[in-house]
């Protein structure tokens, strides 16, 4: 898959 979500720590977009 390839879901992009923001990390609760920095808010960076991670795939």
Swiss-Prot record:
Enzyme class label: isomerase
E.C. number: 5.2.1.8
Domain of life: Eukaryota
GO MF term list: calmodulin binding; peptidyl-prolyl cis-trans isomerase activity
Keyword check for Isomerase: yes
Signal sequence coordinates: none
Catalytic activity: [protein]-peptidylproline (omega=180) = [protein]-peptidylproline (omega=0)
Keywords: Calmodulin-binding, Isomerase, Repeat, Rotamase
Keyword set includes Lipid biosynthesis: no
Subunit structure: This PPIase probably binds calmodulin.
Function recorded in the entry: PPIases accelerate the folding of proteins during protein synthesis.
Note: On the 2D-gel the determined pI of this protein is: 5.3, its MW is: 72 kDa.
Protein name, as recorded: 70 kDa peptidyl-prolyl isomerase
Organism the protein comes from: Pinus pinaster (Maritime pine)
């Amino acid at each position: 898959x390839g879901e992009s979500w923001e990390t609760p720590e920095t808010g960076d977009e991670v795939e």
